[in-house]
Each structure stands twice: as structure tokens, then as C-alpha cells.
């Protein structure tokens, strides 16, 4: 790597001049990602066919081990005063894995080099050399043909053969192997029509076979005429997929036995054989569709954060919570459910759990919870059953589905609390089903992020049976800082979806504003610092803005959940003929971000769509 060309990396304050060559270790900035450790390499064959901008380099990314074209102004050398700063920009597991991967490469580059060669189909460094070899071969072949024409007084030797004729001759003259249905002609290099020569005498059987074959194959014989300087030896000379090659004899002494190998007196044909073999080997190894699919830049899934049963919230420890004597069932141990159950166990509540993936129940069993095989079993064992799943369909399946809550026909002395984010109609349907089985129903919508749940700082919006609300007081005090009872079933769902709409629209506005600042090359951190001093600030927007600036989209509130809430809001507004144009556009922005691969990332990942 030598200093000569100007280079800059987004987010950096210094610029230096560098020229990069293969095997140089670098930092590369790709759209939607923080600077990532990589290496300059020769492009794989499939990348050579892709359109790319000027002043780009092919970069191999450590960790994910894929390839991409990166502009030189988004590249920095790996070693430098900026290394320590860039290494601290992102902390996800994928980034740590990439750093470990490049350190491993520095110690032992063999394994990564082998993978690069395998991904490319042929060694990367040979790609340009192979192309030059093919180009030089074509040029030398043309020069050789011109030289041969000059040496023969302007006459180029042609080989003319009919596969059908040669097969007929071979069938009649197996005993006489010297018989060959070959016609030799000569063509002046500058003439339009071939010059005529007196043909050599042929055996009688060969002549009769030739006449019989020509009656039906005149056109195909004409199509099969080839010149030695036009078609590589061994190619399909008929121009048809299933045509067979006949034996050919070249005037000058070449026989059918040594023609394919190219006689020592024909360097042009021999060179053509080498080029043909090289092209065939490249085509066989390339597998372009598979390589293009595997080497596309991808969005990695966010790291699944395992529940830490030993962590304790300081806020929760300061609260004076007296656990209820009732047994609480919990259906669903997802991102929010697992955090809530952990806090309930910590505060001394008796909990029975169920989850579709039984492995997620194991940490809670070790902490003192009891696990059941089906939702119906949980209902039998518990007094009050909480449900917290990802969407309305899942919530209804747990109630009305096979082995669901309503499979236990008599829910007398049982209560069901729906904590999943659902629309009012779904909540009413579930409540009606519970009441028909003599049970009590409460909707308790939770508003907040995963971190707020861990800190016990959620907002609970409840509606339905007031007695159930009071019996759940100790649970709500454990997980929430404020609890509101809003009356009839459906009211809490409406309020929760309205709050989610405000949050989603605000996030899209923040993302677009920061994307504009980025286009102006204004530091996003400076924008966030100034925003913190204004009356517009809020803990939510400040936190999301910092995540956008860092490119850290570890899920606190998944983007797919936010888009789900917007969909429910728009359906609810449609039933009322309420116009919501801004919310509709916001929903489309979130849908597009999901399409880009950020469905399971945090809702702040909407910044990626606005920026790029």
C-alpha cells in the first residue's frame, strides 16, 4: 500500500492518500453498516459482470466472508491511528466475530486465502492473466493465419468434411482403413470464392458412398464446412447440437489420428486447443448463478439476546412488592414475555409457563417456574393466565385453537389477561369466548421497550373486568411504573395503538432528518447533542437517534412489531372512514425497510431506508 491517491471514510475527520493492491487489509464502509474489517482482493468472476462505479475496489469482508465493490473514498487502511476508534464503533456479535476473523487471518492467512480461491471458482490472481492469455491467443491466431497465407502465396488451406459421408464410408470399408471421404480445397486469401484444384483419385466404393450421401445432405454438408482458423479443434463443426464429427485429413500430412492433437507443423491449431481447454475449464468452474447468490451483500440477523436470570433491576429492588398468593400462568416467552416472567419470579410470584419452543422454558424452570405441555394445561394449573405473543392471529390461536384455553370448557374461578398487542375487534372476540366459558377477561396492553420491561418501567393500559385488574395489582406493580384502567374491553387497545402511531411517525421523521444531515456531511452526533438542548427532546427520540448515528440496531422494539401496529391502526381507521395519510406513508416506509431485510432489527433501522 503506497501513498498517492486521496481517500476518505465517512465519519472520519482525516484524509490521506493511498493506493491499494490485493491482500491489503482495510476498513470498508458499506451502506447500512459501520466500518467493517476487510481485504482488497481480485474480483470473483461473477462480480466482473456486475455494473460498478468508477474508483471502486473489490473487498472481501471478514466475518461474513462475502465480496462487494466499495468506493475508494469509503476505504481506509486497517492499521492506523483510527483503528482503535473504528473498532469501538459497533459491538454486535457479528462485528466482534469479524475482528476475530481478521486477527486469525493475520496469524494464519492460508485458510481464508483458500476460501477466496474456492469462492471465485479459480484463483483470483489468475483472472486477469487468463483474460490476457485469451486475448493474446486471438491476436496471435489472426497473425498466424496472415503469415500462413503469405507463405502459401495467398492460399489458405481448408478442411472440408461431411460427418454423414465419413460414417457411410466407414460402414462399407471397415477392412480398408485408408479410405477417407475427404475433399481438399484451397482458397486464396483475397478471393471471394474458393479456387478449384484437381481432386485426387478415390476408391470406387468411396465415390459411390459420396454420391448417395450428397443426394440428401447437400445443405448440411455446406453448413459443416469449416476452416481451421475459424473453429477450435474438437468443437461441434456442424452448428447443430447432435451432429457428429467425421474424420478429416489435412493436406500436408496430418492424419485423423493426430489432427485433434494438432501436428507440430501447425502452431495455430495447437494454440487454439489450449485456448479452448482454458475456456472450457473456466466455464465449468464458474457456476455464476450459485456464486452470485452466495456472494450478494446480506443483512445479518440481529444477535438473539439470551435472558439473564441473574440480572436485577435497581428500580425493581427499591419497590416494596408483596407477591400475590394466586398462581399465575404465562403463555409466550418472547422478547417481552421472558423479561416479564423473570421479574415475576424474582419478586416471589408463583408462575406456570408454556412456550411453543420448549427450550426457552428451561432457564425459568431452573429459577423456580413450572412448565406445562399445552396452553390448556397452564389454564388448569393457574388462577390467572397472562398471554403475550407477537400478533393477533397468534393470540386467537392460543384461545380458540387445538389444546387452547377454551378446550377447558369450564373457566369458573379463572381469569384471562391478554397482554399481546391486538386490535379492539380481536380483544372483543377473545373476551366473548372467555365469558361464554364462565371466565373473566382483562386486556392489559403494555407500552414500552424491552429495556423498559427489564427496568420495570412499562406503562399498563387495562380494560375489562375490574376485579381481575385488582387481583393483578402485585404483578403490574412489578413490571410497570404506571397502570391505567380505561373501562370497557377495547378501550385499552385503541389507546395503545394511538400511542404507537405517534411513536412510529416520530421515528420516520427523525430518520429522514438525520439522513438529510448525513447527505450534508454534518456529524449525526452533533445533531443529537443539539437536539438534546431543545424543547423537542424526548428520551425515546434521543435513544433512537443515537442508535441511528451508531448504526446499532439491536432490537429493543422490533421493526416488524412497529409495522404490525401501524397496519392495525390503518385497518381500524378504515372502518371509521378516517383519513390518515401521514400514517399511511409511515407504514409504507416501514414495509420497505422490512423488505430490505431489517424486519427483526430495532425500529430505528428505518434510518437505513431513509438514508439509502
Curated annotation (Swiss-Prot):
Keywords: Chromosome, DNA-binding. It is found in: Chromosome. CDD domains: PWWP_GLYR1. NAD(+) binds at residues 329-343, 421, 564. Residues 22-81 form the PWWP domain. Its main location: nucleus. Residues 177-193, 201-220 have a biased composition (Low complexity). Residues 319-612 are annotated as: Dehydrogenase domain. GO terms for cellular component: chromatin. The PWWP domain is a H3 reader and strongly binds DNA. In the dehydrogenase domain, the conserved NAD(P)H-binding sites and sequence similarity to plant dehydrogenases suggest that this protein may have oxidoreductase activity. However, since the active site is not conserved, the dehydrogenase domain seems to serve as a catalytically inert oligomerization module. PANTHER family: CYTOKINE-LIKE NUCLEAR FACTOR N-PAC (PTHR43580:SF2), OXIDOREDUCTASE GLYR1-RELATED (PTHR43580). This is Cytokine-like nuclear factor N-PAC. It comes from Drosophila pseudoobscura pseudoobscura (Fruit fly).
Amino acid at each position: 500500500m503506497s501513498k498517492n491517491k486521496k481517500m476518505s471514510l465517512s465519519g472520519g475527520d482525516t484524509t490521506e492518500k493511498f493506493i491499494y493492491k490485493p491482500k491489503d487489509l482495510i476498513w470498508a464502509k458499506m451502506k447500512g453498516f459501520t466500518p467493517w474489517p476487510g481485504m482488497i482482493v481480485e474480483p470473483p468472476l461473477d462480480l466482473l459482470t456486475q455494473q460498478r462505479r468508477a474508483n471502486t475496489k473489490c473487498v472481501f469482508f471478514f466475518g461474513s466472508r462475502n465480496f462487494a465493490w466499495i468506493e475508494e473514498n469509503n476505504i481506509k487502511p486497517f492499521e492506523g491511528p483510527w483503528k482503535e476508534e473504528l473498532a469501538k464503533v459497533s459491538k454486535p456479535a457479528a462485528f466482534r466475530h469479524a475482528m476475530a476473523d481478521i486477527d486469525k487471518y493475520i496469524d494464519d492467512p492460508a485458510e481464508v486465502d483458500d476460501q477466496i480461491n474456492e469462492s471465485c471458482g479459480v484463483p483470483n490472481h489468475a483472472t486477469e492473466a487468463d483474460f490476457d492469455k485469451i486475448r493474446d491467443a486471438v491476436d496471435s491466431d489472426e497473425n498466424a493465419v496472415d503469415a500462413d497465407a503469405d507463405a502459401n502465396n495467398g492460399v489458405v488451406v481448408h478442411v472440408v468434411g461431411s460427418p454423414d459421408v465419413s460414417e457411410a464410408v466407414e460402414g462399407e470399408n471397415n477392412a480398408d482403413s485408408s479410405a477417407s471421404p475427404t475433399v481438399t480445397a484451397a482458397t486464396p486469401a483475397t478471393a471471394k470464392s474458393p479456387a478449384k484444384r484437381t481432386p485426387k483419385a478415390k476408391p470406387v466404393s468411396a465415390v459411390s458412398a459420396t454420391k448417395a450421401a450428397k443426394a440428401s445432405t447437400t445443405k448440411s454438408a455446406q453448413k459443416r464446412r469449416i476452416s481451421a482458423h475459424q473453429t477450435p479443434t474438437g468443437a461441434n463443426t456442424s452448428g447443430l447440437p447432435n451432429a457428429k464429427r467425421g474424420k478429416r485429413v489435412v493436406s500436408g500430412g496430418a492424419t485423423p489420428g493426430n489432427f485433434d492433437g494438432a501436428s507440430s507443423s501447425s502452431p495455430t491449431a495447437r494454440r487454439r486447443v489450449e485456448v479452448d481447454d482454458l475456456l472450457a475449464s473456466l466455464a465449468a468452474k464458474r457456476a455464476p448463478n450459485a456464486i452470485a447468490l452466495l456472494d450478494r451483500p446480506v443483512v445479518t440477523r440481529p444477535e438473539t439476546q439470551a435472558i439473564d436470570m441473574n440480572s436485577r433491576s435497581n428500580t425493581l429492588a427499591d419497590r416494596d412488592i408483596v407477591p400475590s398468593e394466586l398462581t399465575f400462568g404465562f403463555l409466550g416467552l418472547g422478547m417481552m414475555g421472558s423479561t416479564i416472567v423473570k421479574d415475576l419470579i424474582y419478586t416471589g410470584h408463583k408462575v406456570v409457563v408454556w412456550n411453543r419452543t420448549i427450550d426457552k422454558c428451561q432457564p425459568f424452570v431452573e429459577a423456580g417456574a413450572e412448565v406445562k405441555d399445552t396452553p390448556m394445561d397452564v389454564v388448569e394449573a393457574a388462577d390467572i393466565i397472562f398471554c403475550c405473543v407477537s400478533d393477533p392471529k397468534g393470540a386467537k390461536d392460543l384461545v380458540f385453537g387445538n389444546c387452547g384455553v377454551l378446550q377447558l370448557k369450564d373457566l369458573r374461578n379463572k381469569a384471562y389477561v391478554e397482554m399481546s398487542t391486538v386490535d379492539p375487534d380481536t380483544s372483543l372476540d377473545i373476551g366473548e369466548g372467555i365469558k361464554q366459558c364462565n371466565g373473566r377477561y382483562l386486556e392489559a396492553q403494555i407500552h414500552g421497550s424491552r429495556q423498559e420491561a427489564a427496568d420495570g418501567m412499562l406503562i399498563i393500559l387495562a380494560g375489562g373486568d375490574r376485579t381481575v385488574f385488582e387481583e393483578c395489582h402485585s404483578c403490574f406493580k412489578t413490571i410497570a411504573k404506571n397502570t391505567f384502567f380505561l373501562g370497557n374491553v377495547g378501550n385499552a387497545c385503541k389507546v395503545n395503538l394511538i400511542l404507537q402511531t405517534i411513536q412510529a411517525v416520530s421515528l420516520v421523521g427523525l430518520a429522514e432528518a438525520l439522513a438529510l444531515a448525513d447527505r450534508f456531511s454534518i456529524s449525526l452526533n452533533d445533531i443529537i447533542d443539539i437536539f438534546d438542548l431543545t424543547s423537542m427532546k424526548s428520551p425515546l427520540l434521543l435513544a433512537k437517534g443515537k442508535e441511528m448515528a451508531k448504526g446499532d440496531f439491536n432490537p429493543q422494539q422490533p421493526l416488524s412489531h412497529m409495522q404490525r401496529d401501524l397496519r392495525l391502526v390503518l385497518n381500524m381507521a378504515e372502518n371509521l372512514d378516517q383519513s390518515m395519510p401521514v400514517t399511511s406513508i409511515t407504514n409504507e416506509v416501514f414495509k420497505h425497510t422490512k423488505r430490505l431485510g431489517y424486519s427483526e432489527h430495532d425500529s430505528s433501522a428505518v434510518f437505513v431506508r431513509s438514508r439509502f
